[in-house]
């Protein structure tokens, strides 16, 4: 974690705690000639545009005072997006009960992709429910887990 992202985390956490939001990730990147500070937030049930705006305004005010970045940049506050894989324990807890796609290293039930409701994830096992039946998947066999996109 860079000094910038560490400082931003210190500034944003009290804001998120006040509203009951979770910090998912912070990125500070240069793209072309522009710098972007991206703060990804979430909450049970999903984050709204109004939630992002609220955090963006409060964080922007704090950043103007503390000024941890000595050059111009764009601040973006958003949800993690549906394409982001579930990575840490908070991701799995936050998405419990949602339908997920589990991509496997080795096939289970003759497939390397299972779709089901996320029941639980612990150190060793990921449990999803498929057609009312809990399926335990050794976490060492899990390549990636993403929230399933339904149309």
Swiss-Prot record:
Keywords: Cytoplasm, Ribosome biogenesis
Organism listed in the record: Caldicellulosiruptor saccharolyticus (strain ATCC 43494 / DSM 8903 / Tp8T 6331)
Highest taxon in the source lineage: Bacteria
Biological process, per Gene Ontology: ribosomal small subunit assembly; translation
Function per UniProt: Required for maturation of 30S ribosomal subunits.
Annotated PANTHER family: RIBOSOME MATURATION FACTOR RIMP
Main location: cytoplasm
Name of the protein described by the UniProt record: Ribosome maturation factor RimP
Compartment annotation: Cytoplasm
A Pfam family hit: DUF150_C
Homology family: Belongs to the RimP family.
GO cellular component: cytosol
């Amino acid at each position: 974690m860079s000094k910038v992202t560490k400082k931003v985390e210190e500034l944003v956490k009290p804001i998120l705690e006040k509203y009951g939001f979770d910090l998912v990730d912070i990125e500070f990147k240069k793209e072309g000639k522009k710098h972007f500070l991206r703060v990804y937030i979430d909450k049970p049930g999903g984050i709204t545009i109004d939630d992002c705006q609220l955090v963006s305004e409060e964080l922007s005010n704090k950043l103007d005072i503390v000024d941890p970045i000595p050059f111009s940049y764009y601040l973006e506050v958003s949800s993690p997006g549906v394409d982001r894989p579930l990575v840490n324990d908070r991701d799995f807890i936050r998405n419990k009960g949602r339908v997920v796609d589990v991509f496997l290293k080795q096939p289970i039930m003759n497939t390397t992709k299972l779709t089901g409701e996320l029941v639980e994830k612990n150190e060793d096992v990921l449990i999803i429910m498929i057609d009312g039946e809990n399926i335990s998947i050794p976490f060492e066999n899990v390549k990636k887990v993403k929230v399933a996109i339904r149309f």
